[in-house]
Amino acid sequence: VTRAISAITRCRHWTTYYKLLERGSVRTLRLAHALFEVVNNALPMETLNLVIDDTLIPRQSETAPGSAIRHDHAKKTNRPQFLQAQCWVTLGVSVLGNGGRKYVLPIVSRLVPLAGNRNKLIIALALVRGLAPVMMNKPVRILFDAWFMKARLVLPLLSRKMRVIGQARRDTALFMPPVVLLKPRRGRPKIYGVKMTPESILALPVTELKLTLYGKEQLIRLRTVVAMARFLKGRPVRAVWCAFYDADRQCWSKVRLLLATEIELSAENILRLYARRWGIEPLFHNLKRWWGVNNLWQQKRIVLELWMQIRSTAWTLVQLLSLVAEESFPITVVAPWRNKQPLTGGLVAQWLRMEFTGLAFRDGFNRKSSIFTFPEQCGDPRFRG
């Protein structure tokens, strides 16, 4: 916050800006709606691919909003299994950049509270419901990992005509469709057929192919079938069992199960679509490491979520500029040694600091004529006339 205040032309005391953030009436959902519309207009998409995931931000203070002893399911080397941290649930939009690179642009985040009945599943559903008014009736596909693949979240999404692709537990109860009887019998018709056992899964046809996923070409072994998921109350899903070949260890990885409610999709397409979820992991890393999320100090949940929304908005706009403004970007002024190289969000952020630091926006607005004239740049000397 201090760095943000120091970057503007201040006309009030420092405390005024802190109080503006703490007592302001800015609603995070309105900011999220406006941000979503900007992304949708800049990068039109026939189908909206949304990603939902959670992350932990370590905290020393036990009195910080939402700070508690939480389980770290990342299982990183030399890291404790439980730590004092805040848990955030984020909803982002998956977009494709140059060379097919996958990005996730954060739209809105919510802090998991310390007390109450609101858990991550309820918050994730609330985030989708909050963005529904600005989705403009477009087809929506939501991607998430195994933790969010629960009936409590998936069934309400399906009732909203949304599509879901997610990883599930390998022991998820799956059944073949029931056999259609030529002659009707008495009683209720069967919902499930034969249960899928490990033996029946191994008996499925195997397909081996090479796909470029997660940044490299990988050899993948696939098995797929259309089955009925019991935790979804018998809804048909396309089940894909996939294993990756580890060239270093010369062995296959453990089998992972992906479920897609779009049964018309092929196993290859499901794998490609689910790989777009991984873009949220570098997003969390960059927000924590380079965009100050690790240093959020606000002592009230509402203020903390507001500043998190401001940081997410800044990150999304920077990444959006790197995707749509590459041809007109002044790379020879910002970083001439990076000429003819792909434009990154870091270069855009550097240009924004050079262009807008110390810019007196209030001086550019004429109250008498109600006309805004872009003020003279008085920050970085490279942009002075």
Q: Where do the language-model regions lie?
A:
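Short amphipathic alpha-helical surface micro-motifs
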Residues: 1, 31-34, 70-74, 88-91, ...
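Gly/serine-rich nucleotide phosphate-binding loop at the start of the catalytic core
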Residues: 1-29, 35
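Amphipathic alpha-helical interaction elements
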Residues: 6-9, 40, 275
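Hydrophobic, well-ordered secondary-structure segments
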Residues: 16-19, 30-44, 121-130, 139
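Active-site-proximal, Lys/Arg-enriched surface segment
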Residues: 22-102, 108-110, 226-229
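Single, function-defining residue in the core of a domain
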Residues: 46, 63, 98-385
